[in-house]
Amino acid sequence: MGTSTATISTAAWADDHTPRIAILGAGPTGLGAGYRLKELGYKNFQLFDRHEYVGGLAHSFTDAQGFTWDIGGHVMFSHYSYYDRVFDALMGEEYTLNNRESWVRMFDRWVPYPFQNNIRYLPKEAAFECMSGLIKAQNGKGKIASPTLARNFGEFIDAVFGEGIAKHFMRPYNYKVWAYEPEAMNKQWIGERVAVLDVDRALKNVMLGTDDFGWGPNNQFKFPLRGGTGEFYRRFGPALGLGKSGGECHVNLRKRVVSIDLERKVLSFSDGTAEHYDILISTMPLDVLCNSVLRGDVPAGVKSAAAGLKHSSGYMVGIGLRSRAPGAGTPDTKSWMYFPESNCPFYRVTYLSNYSPHMTPDRANYYSLLCETSESPAKPTRGDNGRDTEAMIEETIVGLENAGLLEPGERKNIVSRWCYYADYSYPTPSVERDEILTQVIPFLESHDIYSRGRFGMWKYEVSNTDHTLMQGVECVNRLLLGEPETTIGMTYQITQDGREAAVHERSAQAGSGEKRLSKPAAAQTPVPQTRAANLGVTADGVEVQVPGVARVVVRPRAAGAVLAA
């Protein structure tokens, strides 16, 4: 997959009378959209973010003790040649290349990830439970006869992995990650995120005692040499004119939008200022956009649908320590680790100090652990919705001791305690999510609002930083060049044995390519006329059913037309 990198060499998009494009959010999606607009020579756009920095959830912080922390365990691996080229253009050679070393902590031992391919590391009784359940499931004798019959992620787990693996790892771990039971989630999101099982491979690993470490697209990953993950995204700021004056600057920080007038197309900010737009690319959470920010004739059905989206919050707790001996550095070579058991609050811990020699004040004498804990109405924590981060830090330290990551007495070596609370951490791929998107996204696009990104599109399966950056790029390609948005249209087809293949389709929710800004006739690019799977295609556009609205037709723009300023 990928995207066109063709640019327009003429001044076709430089005219001040072109439609004004506003972008809300300077995370990967917004930055990707802005970067692509500038690359295409389009000048009439502005990007707004409520923070004093760019990067969104991909930002990094350096604390007073000199430790650098990410908002979660980010690594940089890419599905896109375009993303790779942008990374190379902005970062040059200033990155490290790391081999992934992932483990699962359970039964007081370390099991190589993926757990389901390394059952031989378990106690014999648990290993037997896992293999027996797996064989039954793969022969259609488990709780669910086939993955194709599974109605949700919980049933998918039972159908593919069997009772043993479900009991010991898949169910407890996924509850800790998502903060919802697997039955509340759909099965379509899985794709590359979960390693499904080849029963012969699993049996061979058990019988022959072989290890199986190689699954996944991120076996090897890049990481910025300095500044954490956020350094890559920080560099988009200067590329988009941050710090410059006049029309050269396209980035506006400390700008929190409080309302969006649908009819007048006006953004109102908390500082009392307002901005007109013709086209809006929004990356704010979709439920917030529809229920708290939009002003105007928003159907009750759209509001109630968006309110039904689920998400989890998250605590990112950083623990910086002196090394166990002078010059000893990080005590382990592991990259990150998974924790399905209940003796610790976190689901994942990362040795950030292994990613780059500059993540601590002194690589030889300090190391760092980043711990992630989820929270939702279905899974409350001592953190109490971010109101008591000190309680979460203390519980995290106790959990590190319970899990064996901190040795007895090592607590005294802690020199940094950092915590970031993300109210919106994971967009839950709930059972009802896709139906909600089918109701909400077309309504927004009928008003020239393109909701994209991790929480703008609410598709966790395409919410890695490369995916989300490309959502912004592809949205611009759609608007200016008439190209389809392949990332948000990605689906996974589940086969009889539970294996899946990524399929790039024209999305039923958005990205059907039918709507774009018109270019001057000399530079026109034909618009693909592909039928969207679940939408009625009429002579005058794409007809969608939106609760509370009799008929919404998303119409293509006439050749040569531009929106009125």
Model-derived segments and spans:
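A short, basic/flexible loop-to-alpha-helix module at the beginning of a structural domain
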Residues: 2-17
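N-terminal Rossmann-like FAD-binding beta1-loop-alpha1 element of flavoenzymes
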Residues: 13, 19-47
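Dinucleotide-binding Rossmann-like beta1-alpha1 core, especially the glycine-rich loop
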Residues: 65-145
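C-terminal lid/capping helical subdomain adjacent to the catalytic/cofactor pocket in oxidative enzymes
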Residues: 7, 11, 430-565
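Active-site/ligand-binding neighborhood in enzyme catalytic cores
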Residues: 119-120, 126-127, 131-263, 276, ...
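C-terminal segments that line or cap access tunnels to active or ligand-binding sites in enzymes
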Residues: 277-279, 283-450, 457-461, 467-470, ...
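Conserved Rossmann-like nucleotide-cofactor binding loop
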Residues: 29, 53, 287
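Glycine-rich FAD pyrophosphate-binding loop
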Residues: 38-62
